[in-house]
Swiss-Prot record:
Listed NCBIfam families: rplB_bact
Native species: Mycobacterium marinum (strain ATCC BAA-535 / M)
GO biological process: cytoplasmic translation
Family the entry assigns: Belongs to the universal ribosomal protein uL2 family.
Lineage: Bacteria, Bacillati, Actinomycetota, Actinomycetes, Mycobacteriales
Protein name per its UniProtKB record: Large ribosomal subunit protein uL2
Cited SUPFAM superfamilies: Nucleic acid-binding proteins (SSF50249), Translation proteins SH3-like domain (SSF50104)
Length: 280
C-alpha cells in the first residue's frame, strides 16, 4: 500500500492524503458473506444517546469475518481476492477452500492473490496460517489472537498491528501487546502468523472534517466552550480554564475508568506505559 497526496486545490485538499488501494483486487464483496448493517446514531432502544459523537456517515454492509478458523484444520485455502472493508482499517482476504466453502479473514502483510493458507497445529509458520500458540516458535509476530480457547480472535486486528510471542511456560504463553503490555494467554488459544497489513493507514491525513462525517463521526465539543447548563466546565466571562479538575459532562472525574478488580488482571505480567501518574 502507498499513500497518494492531493494537490492543494482547496483548503480541504491541502495536506490531505488517501490510500492508493493498489492491493485491492475486487471492488464488490462476496454476496454470500455480506449482512445488512443498520446505523443507530449512538442511540439505544429508547432513543437516548448512549455514545456521543456518532451518527450519519456512508451506508455500509457488514462482511462476515472468520475469527476462529478452528473448523478448517487441514483444509487448504487459496486467496481469491484482497478486498476493502469499510468496517475496519485492515484489508480482508477472500479464501476459497478446497471443500468449496468461501470465507473472509483479515489480510496479513505480504499476503497476495493466489497464495495458499492453512490452519491447524501442523501448518507452516508463514503469514496467513492459523495455529495454536503452543505450535508457534518464540519470537514470531502474530495477529488475530484469541484471549480464550475457541473464543475467536480479539487481539491485534487493526491495520499494522502485531503481537510478539515471547515464550511459553507450562500452559501459558507470554505475549507483548502493541501497547507494550506483556500478558499471559493460554497456549491453546489460536493466532495467525504475521502482522496485519495496510500499515500505512496510520499516516493518512484526513484533510477536512467532512471526511470524518463520511465515516460516521460527529464533532467532539469541549466542555469549556459550552454553557453552564450543558457541562460542569461551561460558562464564565471570556475564556476560562473550567475552574475545576477535568470531569465528564455528568460530573465524574476523568481517568481511572477501568475496573481494578478485573479477574484477568492477574495474567498481566507488565503493564503498558501510560505516561501519566498513578498508572492511569
Amino acid at each position: 500500500m502507498a499513500i497518494r497526496k492531493y494537490k492543494p486545490t482547496t483548503p480541504g485538499r491541502r495536506g490531505a492524503s488517501v490510500s492508493d488501494f493498489a492491493e485491492i483486487t475486487r471492488s464488490t464483496p462476496e454476496k454470500s458473506l455480506v449482512r445488512p448493517l443498520h446505523g443507530h446514531g449512538g442511540r439505544n432502544a429508547h432513543g437516548r444517546i448512549t455514545t456521543r459523537h456518532k451518527g450519519g456517515g456512508h451506508k455500509r454492509a457488514y462482511r462476515v469475518i472468520d475469527f476462529r478458523r478452528n473448523d478448517k484444520d487441514g483444509v487448504n485455502a487459496k486467496v481469491a481476492h484482497i478486498e476493502y472493508d469499510p468496517n475496519r482499517t485492515a484489508r480482508i482476504a477472500l479464501l476459497h477452500y478446497l471443500d468449496g466453502e468461501k470465507r473472509y479473514i483479515i489480510a496479513p502483510n505480504g499476503l497476495s492473490q493466489g497464495d495458499v493458507v492453512e490452519s491447524g497445529a501442523n501448518a507452516d509458520i508463514k503469514p496467513g496460517n492459523n495455529l495454536p500458540l503452543r505450535n508457534i516458535p518464540a519470537g514470531t509476530l502474530v495477529h488475530a489472537v484469541e484471549l480464550r480457547p475457541g473464543g475467536g480472535a480479539k487481539l491485534a486486528r487493526s491495520a499494522g498491528s502485531s503481537i510478539q510471542l515471547l515464550g511459553k511456560e507450562a500452559s501459558y504463553a507470554s505475549l507483548r501487546m502493541p501497547s507494550g503490555e506483556i500478558r499471559r494467554v493460554d497456549v491453546r488459544c489460536r493466532a495467525t502468523v504475521g502482522e496485519v497489513g495496510n500499515a500505512e493507514q496510520a499516516n493518512i491525513n484526513w484533510g477536512k472534517a467532512g471526511r470524518m462525517r463520511w465515516k460516521g463521526k460527529r464533532p467532539s465539543v469541549r466542555g469549556v466552550v459550552m454553557n453552564p447548563v450543558d457541562h460542569p466546565h461551561g460558562g464564565g466571562e471570556g475564556k476560562t480554564s473550567g475552574g475545576r479538575h477535568p470531569v465528564s459532562p455528568w460530573g465524574k472525574p476523568e481517568g481511572r475508568t477501568r475496573n481494578p478488580n478485573k479477574a484477568s488482571n492477574k495474567l498481566i505480567v507488565r503493564r503498558r506505559r501510560t505516561g501519566k501518574k498513578h498508572g492511569r
